[in-house]
Curated annotation (Swiss-Prot):
One of its GO terms (biological process) is amino acid biosynthetic process. It holds the Pfam family SDH_C. Homodimer. This is Shikimate dehydrogenase (NADP(+)). It catalyses: shikimate + NADP(+) = 3-dehydroshikimate + NADPH + H(+).
Length: 279
């Protein structure tokens, strides 16, 4: 009897992950025979665990916080968008035994913002909180939407400024510390820090969200994250967490692995309904 193909997501922490549920729904929808699990893999064990997974018959991996830049280094070859981001969230074992790295975060975020939430980013002022691997993965697609300005705020200013040098050819991008945000307003604020995973909120001026502005947290949880609640308190038109992005980027990874694109809207609706029921 043929065994189902094996896939997994590696992260640290990982117990909150909805990825196994998402890929189970994708597999049922498309008739694909596979198993997808979530594995807690600390950074110091990442490479050995990846090698062991693929040596043991695994076909593909997702990598989440804090492993995306390590996955970029490990991959033998990379997609154009992964090369640009210098971060990888999807690994594929090729027939020749080499490991291919892709980054589906940016297109996943863009599809959720644009197609699911109905946001038009052209001419807007965008603020991204954090300058890690998650931010690297979303910068190029966001700048391709031609915002008026994109600002990256980070506790370590030099890290944010490094990204402005790397991505400055794609559009108007600048880096700064959180203190430099005083007196500025933005139409879309994206939280790409890990603060929500520990129940914290990045330090933001009270009036930083422009009237009619929106908030988006790349993280997600069973309950609204502190950043999503902050956006709701500021009367954001949209204040959403990253569950839609997670589904959209997962669909792109599923396409890479299986050659078929699942429908995302039914899966997003199922997850939202399950969250409401669980409350």
């Amino acid at each position: 009897m043929t065994q189902p193909d094996r896939y997994a997501v590696f992260g640290h922490p990982i117990e909150h992950s909805q990825s196994p549920r998402i890929h189970a729904l994708f597999a049922a929808q498309t008739g694909q025979d596979l198993i997808y699990t979530a594995e807690d893999v600390p950074p110091d064990r990442f490479e050995s665990c990846v090698r062991a997974f693929f040596d043991g018959g695994g076909r593909g991996l997702n990598c989440t916080i804090p492993l995306k830049e390590m996955a970029w280094l490990l991959a033998d070859s990379r997609s154009g968008r992964a090369k640009r981001a210098r971060a990888v969230n999807t690994l594929l074992l090729r027939a020749d035994g080499s490991i291919f790295g892709d980054n589906t975060d940016g297109i996943g975020l863009l599809r959720d913002l644009r197609d699911n939430l109905g946001l038009n980013l052209a001419g807007t002022k965008i603020l991204i909180l954090g300058a890690g691997g998650a931010t690297r993965g979303i910068l190029a697609p966001l700048l391709a939407e031609r915002p008026d300005r994109l600002v990256i705020a980070n506790r370590t200013v030099a890290t944010a400024e490094t990204l402005t040098v790397e991505f400055g050819d794609l559009g108007p991008v600048e880096g700064c510390g959180f203190a430099a945000l005083a007196g500025r307003r933005f139409d879309l604020i994206i939280n790409a820090t890990a603060a929500s995973l520990s129940g914290e909120l990045p330090p933001l001026p009270a009036d930083i969200l422009a009237p009619g502005g929106s908030c988006y947290d790349l993280a997600y949880a069973a309950e609204p994250t502190p950043f999503v609640r902050w956006g709701q308190e500021k009367q954001a038109v949209v204040s959403a967490d990253g569950i839609g992005m997670l589904v959209e980027q997962a669909a792109e990874a599923f396409l890479l692995w299986r050659g078929v694109r699942p429908q995302t809207r039914p899966v997003i609706e199922t997850l939202e309904a399950e969250r409401r029921t669980a409350k």
